[in-house]
A protein has these predicted regions:
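N-terminal Rossmann-like FAD-binding beta1-loop-alpha1 element of flavoenzymes
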Residues: 4-30
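N-terminal glycine-rich dinucleotide-binding loop that anchors FAD/FMN and/or NAD(P) in oxidoreductases
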Residues: 44-73
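Glycine-rich FAD pyrophosphate-binding loop
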Residues: 23-48
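Conserved flavin/dinucleotide-binding core of flavoenzymes
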Residues: 329-431
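Conserved Rossmann-like nucleotide-cofactor binding loop
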Residues: 14, 36, 273
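Mid-domain catalytic core of redox enzymes
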Residues: 236-375
Length: 431
């Protein structure tokens, strides 16, 4: 008997995971508007590694992960055979005028890794006091009983928590969180406290940061086996007839031609702001929920312009934050040569989030603007309604994306949301 057909719209981590998890039970077609699957759509070539002579590709964004927080993603990578490697994301914090705030570095002794103050050159009374505040903060945040912070925003929680040292919160913690959540400080403070604490308490500071050794291209190659991928297909509309078992029509533009295909089920794995226009006519009541989910824009530049760093930059920790108190976000630059083993022997190359100074155009390799949902208590109500809509009997329209998982919309949440949909459609976790 032939399998039922299923369309997945969008090939970020959520769509790729859903398509892969459902490939045995359904005849799956994955549609992506970019020329390459979305997770790897913005990768850029960065020349060759001068030691190995191998070509180097840089993913945009890098997509780093931590073992304590990314349970399902680690399981997925293991099942797919994706190798992972450690990266160094320790930080150097400066004011926008170049004044020292805080420097820490990751040290390795045998198998153990730990964060501590950077080189003696950077030791100062101020740096030591920030270091002590950080140690205290991360030790105490693990002890917070999440059931006691249920109604608090993260901002409210910080205001009443005795371990919140204003200097550390404003100059170190908020710049880091604003970079991780890619939104402004006010939006970070509007996150439910339990979500941010859940992230901070998961050993982020202790176990360090990892990434896929061979980058997103390797993940995509493994996770696109066993089903059909249709790139360059910009979905315009989805037509759903309420009559039971009537096919769902997917209408899309490919190379300036309009095409149409029919499916038994559909998984919309785009971000919420892109899902709404697709189902405006077919499911207006759900569109209202999508329209309430806010998103933030952020830009990322990959470049070779070292003037972005305070001098001398060579001994700084890999991630350099520039903090201007009159702005709502820091500028954060990763020196990829220091952070990633595969890029160590390449010409200097940097990835800057939210540039606030000019990066030389002739040293720029890529400049990409991203959108990403931000979570607050109002958003959570609408997300819950979207989840409930999928539990209706005989439902055939499914949604997944990192905004529908638990916690911060990161890769882990994307995989969680795909597992939820796969489970509803009769496919179980292969791990
Ligand atoms: C700057 C930045 C840095 C980040 N760094 C990290 C990190 O280090 N670690 C981490 O865990 N997370 C990180 N994230 C978050 C992570 O990238 C997201 O959580 C994740 O990409 C969301 O996956 P998704 O599948 O839900 O959505 P997306 O990745 O947005 O995928 C949706 C896909 O749908 C496609 N699409 C949309 N509309 C249509 C249409 N009409 N037709 C066809 N296709 C369509 C899009 O092109 C896209 O490919 C970062 C995010 C940003 C913005």
């Amino acid at each position: 008997m032939s399998k039922p057909t299923l369309a997945v719209i969008g090939s970020g981590i959520a769509g790729l995971s859903a398509a892969w998890l459902l490939r045995n039970q359904y005849q799956v077609t994955l549609f992506e508007r970019h020329a390459r699957p979305g997770m790897g759509a913005y990768a850029v070539s960065a020349g060759t590694n001068q030691r190995t002579g191998k070509a180097v590709t840089i993913d945009i964004p890098l997509r780093v992960i931590t073992s304590g927080y990314y349970n399902e993603l680690f399981n997925l990578y293991k099942t797919l055979g994706v190798e992972i490697e450690r990266t160094d994301h320790s930080g150097a914090f400066f004011t926008h005028t170049g004044g020292d705030i805080f420097h820490y570095k990751t040290y390795t002794i045998g198998e153990r890794r730990f964060a501590f103050l950077n080189s003696p050159k950077r030791l100062s009374k101020h740096n030591i006091s920030q270091g002590m505040a950080a140690i205290k903060f991360f030790a105490e945040i693990k002890k917070v009983d999440l059931s006691n912070v249920g109604n608090l925003t993260f901002g409210e929680f910080l205001q009443q928590w005795p371990h919140s040292k204003a200097n550390f919160i404003d100059n170190v913690l908020m710049p880091m969180l604003s970079t991780i959540c890619t939104c402004d400080y006010d939006s970070v403070k509007q996150y439910p406290a339990s979500i941010i604490i859940g992230y901070l308490a998961c050993g982020v500071a202790k176990d360090g940061v990892w990434k896929a050794t061979h980058g997103v291209a390797d993940i995509v190659q493994r996770i696109t086996q066993g089903y059909q991928v249709e790139a360059n297909c910009d979905i315009q509309n989805i037509k759903i007839d309420d009559t039971e078992n009537s096919p769902i029509q997917v209408i899309f533009n490919r190379h300036q031609q309009t095409e149409k295909q029919s499916f038994d089920h559909i998984v919309i794995a785009t971000q919420p702001q892109h899902a709404a226009p697709l189902i405006e006519a077919a499911a207006p009541e759900i569109v209202q929920h999508f329209k309430h989910i806010k998103y933030a824009k952020s830009s990322m530049v990959v470049h070779r312009d070292d003037s972005i760093y305070p001098r001398p930059w060579q001994d700084l920790s890999p991630v350099c934050y520039s903090i201007n108190p009159s702005l709502q976000r820091p500028m954060a630059t990763v020196c990829l040569n220091k952070s990633m083993p595969t890029v160590k022997d390449c010409l200097p190359i940097f990835q800057t989030w939210h540039p606030t100074t000019t990066i030389a155009a002739d040293k720029t390799l890529a400049d990409v603007t991203f959108e990403r949902p931000v979570i607050n208590f109002d958003t959570l109500k609408h997300i819950e309604s979207i989840k409930q809509s999928m539990l209706k009997a005989n439902n055939r329209v499914w949604f997944c994306g990192s905004y529908l998982g638990e916690g911060i919309p990161l890769l882990e949440a994307g995989v969680q949301s795909a597992l939820f949909v796969a489970n509803q459609l009769g496919a179980y976790k292969p791990w």
